[in-house]
Amino acid sequence: MSEENQQPERQFAIQKLYVKDVSFETPNSPAVFTLKWEPKVEFNLGSKVQQLQEGLFEVSLSVTITVKLEEKTAYLVEICQAGIFTISGFPEQEMGPLLGSYCPNILFPYAREAVSDLVNKGGFPPMLLAPINFDALYMQQVQMAQQQAQPATPH
């Protein structure tokens, strides 16, 4: 069997996991600690991929949580959890799900832990983030991109 017919060996490895950016703000403290704890929570999530070199990618997961009491911001947490991943030998159609779903799924527990620690150290009740289905989010993004790419048809 010639080497030309062999597929490249698939390789996936975590090179480094790190906090790229973090912020915790309590703009209305200490007054906010006197209010009844009935929070309104806003949660935003995003991810970004950057190819560093052939087969080496940085994936970053951004989490922003704003908690309000009576329209006053109790706290705002922002974290960008990132990782550097070696990914090579995979077919092109598998790279999107790896970078858009699998890698963020690896990063999320670290971001969740950082959020929990920051909120606890800020003197607030625990903020426990539920697991996220990154496969479903990725598929939703793919479908939205496909819909936007299609020209509008008259009805």
Curated annotation (Swiss-Prot):
HAMAP family per record: SecB (MF_00821)
Tell me which species this is from. Methylococcus capsulatus (strain ATCC 33009 / NCIMB 11132 / Bath)
Q: Which UniProt keywords apply?
A: Chaperone, Cytoplasm, Protein transport, Translocation, Transport
In terms of InterPro entries, this protein maps to: SecB (IPR003708), SecB-like_sf (IPR035958)
Family affiliation: Belongs to the SecB family.
An example GO CC term for this entry is: cytoplasm
Question: A GO BP term, please?
Answer: protein folding
Q: What is its main location?
A: cytoplasm
Name listed for the protein in its UniProt record? Protein-export protein SecB
User: What Gene3D superfamilies does the record tag this protein with?
Assistant: SecB-like
Function of the protein: One of the proteins required for the normal export of preproteins out of the cell cytoplasm. It is a molecular chaperone that binds to a subset of precursor proteins, maintaining them in a translocation-competent state. It also specifically binds to its receptor SecA.
Any one Pfam family here would be: SecB
Molecular function via GO: unfolded protein binding
Under the subunit heading, UniProt states:
Homotetramer, a dimer of dimers. One homotetramer interacts with 1 SecA dimer.
Where does this one sit in the cell?
A: Cytoplasm
